[in-house]
């Protein structure tokens, strides 16, 4: 349950400018990770540019923030198009004067046609790579250019616990592992510029994209999908988008100002199954 409602002008991100890529969400019940992060950042005082391929969904997120008294705007960008990502970063700086936080929260697996090694097609593989990995790289490229010039900033990339744990679908696992490797390189190469970069590794999170895709792919009810996923988590339940958003907020805030290059699992202990 979200217990942090209300805009906080003197909050942990007070006066900061945050771009959230993937701030809309897929159709279905519940809250998506990107929308939750955008709302959470705004509640802690950030100006938020909600970026999504579906402008209506981004506008919905921005409207939710503004209704609570926060500061937000919506922007349409497809992460497979570099120039649109560049425009998003430029818009944030032009509107609010800086770019302090970039949160990349885009990824597809089953919804993008992923499969096991013997089933995946070249087109499916390339499409998922463009969304999951290339989009993150080029969003960071254009954010870093601004952050270097202004003397610092924070990047929080969303990878996945699937990058390190068991996962049956080849492209999602490979691309999310790539996000970890890229973020480590990003952190090391940009530390001299005052830029921090970290990853979040969500586990089984009850978001519209994750649950709805499996309802359709497995021909199961919502209750069946949820029960199966809950049983795989040592803490006995799926996480929520707010769990991921709270981790993103911590890494984006000055509380984490000596943390860079890490991968923070938000998975209810699921990666412990590797031990």
Named regions from a protein language model:
Residues 108, 145, 188-192, 257:
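Alpha-helical segment proximal to the catalytic Tyr-Lys
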Residues 160:
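Residue(s) in the substrate-gating loop at a strand-loop-helix junction
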Residues 140, 175, 183:
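Active-site helix of classical SDR
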Residues 113-117, 121-126, 229:
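Substrate-binding pocket helix/loop in short-chain dehydrogenase/reductase
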Residues 2-8, 114, 231, 237, ...:
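Short C-terminal tail/terminal secondary-structure segment
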Residues 29, 115-116, 166-174, 185, ...:
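Active-site loop-to-helix junction immediately N-terminal to the catalytic Tyr of the SDR YXXXK motif
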Residues 10-49:
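Canonical Rossmann dinucleotide-binding motif of NAD(H)/NADP(H)-dependent dehydrogenases/reductases
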């Amino acid at each position: 349950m979200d217990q942090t409602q209300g805009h906080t002008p003197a909050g942990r991100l007070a006066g900061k400018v945050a771009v959230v890529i993937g701030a809309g969400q897929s159709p279905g019940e519940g809250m998506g990770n990107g929308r939750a992060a955008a709302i959470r950042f705004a509640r802690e005082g950030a100006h938020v540019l909600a970026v999504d391929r579906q402008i209506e969904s981004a506008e919905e997120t921005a409207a939710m923030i503004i209704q609570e008294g926060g500061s937000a705007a919506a922007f349409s960008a497809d992460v497979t198009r570099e120039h649109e990502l560049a425009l998003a970063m430029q818009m944030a700086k032009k509107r609010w004067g800086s770019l302090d936080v970039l949160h990349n929260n885009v990824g597809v697996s089953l919804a993008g046609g992923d499969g096991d090694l013997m089933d995946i097609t070249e087109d499916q593989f390339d499409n998922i790579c463009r969304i999951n990995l290339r989009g993150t790289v080029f969003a960071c490229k254009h954010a870093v250019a601004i952050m270097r010039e202004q003397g610092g900033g924070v990047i929080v990339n969303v990878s996945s616990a699937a990058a390190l744990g068991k996962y049956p679908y080849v492209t999602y696992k490979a691309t999310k592992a790539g996000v970890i490797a890229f973020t480590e390189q990003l952190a090391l190469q940009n530390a001299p510029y005052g830029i921090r970069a970290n990853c979040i590794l969500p586990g089984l999170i009850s978001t519209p994209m994750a649950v709805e895709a499996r309802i359709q792919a497995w021909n199961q009810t919502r209750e069946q999908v949820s029960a199966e996923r809950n049983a795989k988590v040592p803490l006995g339940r799926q996480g929520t988008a707010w769990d991921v958003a709270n981790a993103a907020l911590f890494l984006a805030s000055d509380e984490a100002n000596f943390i860079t290059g890490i991968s923070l699992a938000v998975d209810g202990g699921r990666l412990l199954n590797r031990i």
